[in-house]
Amino acid sequence: MNIIRKLKPGTISLVLGPMFAGKTTFLIHCIYMLEHLEKKVVFIKSTKNTRDKTIKTHSGIQLRPKHCKIIESTQLSDVGSLTDIHAVVIDEAHFFDDLIKCRTWADEEKIIILAGLNASFEQKMFPPIVRIFPYCSWVKYIGRTCMKCNRHNACFNVRKNADKTLILAGGSELYVTCCNNCLKNTFIKQLQPIKY
């Protein structure tokens, strides 16, 4: 996989998928490749993600960059000047209501790489992802196997409890990723009502 050829200055790339699919692992890989090319990279993480204060995947892989600057923020507009940065990498992009700010950075000839969930626990796309999608020059979908049946491709994020808060950060203690068959035969019955 030579992703670097697709990552051009002035472009926005988007990686989507369900939870536990490897989106953050993919971002870490991109950061290491960009650093190898001596690009100055900033990694932006939402303060809404309260799971972990480090840059770590659900599987335990941790980001140990050489020169990457790591910023935690609630809004992208609070990040400040990125004049000396070549690439902006954003994890959990769906957490940023002002994700459209990435267009400004792309206009400044920065490489923008975003990763976010394909849908909420209600199986609806997050508004920030919907707004930025038309400006993405490259989109990658990363899937995973259903955590319930282990047979089919999973694309649905299902919350294990009845909390209806849209943004509720957590891992496998709060969420399961499942296929369509398990969603309709198991989880919809348990978690009524999921509206399409």
UniProtKB/Swiss-Prot annotation:
Residue numbers binding ATP: G17, P18, M19, F20, A21, G22, K23, T24
GO MF, one example: ATP binding
Binding site for substrate: F121, L166, I167, L168, A169, G170
Binding-site residues, Zn(2+): C146, C149, C179, C182
GO BP: DNA biosynthetic process; thymidine metabolic process
Catalysed transformations (reactions): thymidine + ATP = dTMP + ADP + H(+)
EC number, as in UniProt: 2.7.1.21
Highest taxon above the source species: Viruses
Residues at the active site: E92 (proton acceptor)
Job of this protein: Phosphorylates thymidine. ASFV replicates in the cytoplasm of infected cells and contains genes encoding a number of enzymes needed for DNA synthesis, including thymidine kinase. Important for growth in swine macrophages in vitro and is a virus virulence factor in swine.
UniProt record similarity statement: Belongs to the thymidine kinase family.
Protein name from the UniProt record: Thymidine kinase
Organism: African swine fever virus (isolate Warthog/Namibia/Wart80/1980)
Source taxonomy: Viruses, Varidnaviria, Bamfordvirae, Nucleocytoviricota, Pokkesviricetes
